[in-house]
Regions:
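Intrinsically disordered, low-complexity regulatory regions
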Residues: 1-142
C-alpha cells in the first residue's frame, strides 16, 4: 500500500532525526522526496482507481503528476495566506510529526473504508503531507 510506503519513509526520517548513528548513508532529503512522490501516486490512484497492472502511459502519468502537484501547490499558497506562513517558524522534526499524524488519519480512513466523521477527505491529507515535505526540504536548503 502506498500509505505504508509513506509511513516507512516518515518513520525513517523520524529515526534519522533522533539517532546520531546512521548505518545507511542516505539522508532525510531523499525520504522527503519519496513521501512527495508516493503521495502524488496516491492522489492519482484516488482519481483513477486501483489496478493490478500499470494502465497509463508515461506521458499520461507525467500529466497526472503535474496536475496533482499544481493543485497541491495552489492549496499550499491558499493555506499560507490564511496561516501567515507559520511553517517558516517550525522545526523539521515538527513537520515530520505532522506527516506522521496525517498518516494516522489516512490509515484510519482506509480502515473505515473511506468513511469519515468530521475529518477532511483522504486526498486533503495526502496534499498536506506533500506540502509538509516540501516545507521540510526548504528548511534543509533543498
Amino acid at each position: 500500500s502506498l500509505t505504508d510506503q509513506i509511513f516507512i519513509k516518515a518513520q525513517r526520517i523520524r529515526q534519522l532525526q533522533e539517532n546520531a548513528v546512521r548505518k545507511v548513508d542516505e539522508g532525510e532529503r531523499g525520504e522527503f522526496i519519496g513521501i512527495i512522490n508516493y503521495c502524488v501516486m496516491a492522489l492519482i490512484q484516488i482519481e483513477l482507481g486501483v489496478v493490478e497492472n500499470p494502465d497509463v502511459s508515461t506521458e499520461e502519468a507525467t500529466e497526472l503528476y503535474d496536475k496533482h502537484i499544481a493543485i497541491t501547490k495552489e492549496l499550499m499558497e491558499n493555506k499560507n495566506h490564511d496561516y501567515g506562513e507559520a511553517w517558516r517558524d517550525m522545526r523539521i522534526s515538527s513537520l515530520t510529526d505532522l506527516i506522521l499524524q496525517k498518516l494516522l488519519r489516512v490509515k484510519t480512513i482506509e480502515n473505515n473504508k473511506g468513511k469519515t466523521l468530521v475529518s477532511e477527505g483522504i486526498d486533503a491529507n495526502y496534499q498536506d503531507m506533500i506540502n509538509y515535505a516540501i516545507f521540510a526540504m526548504i528548511h534543509m536548503g533543498s
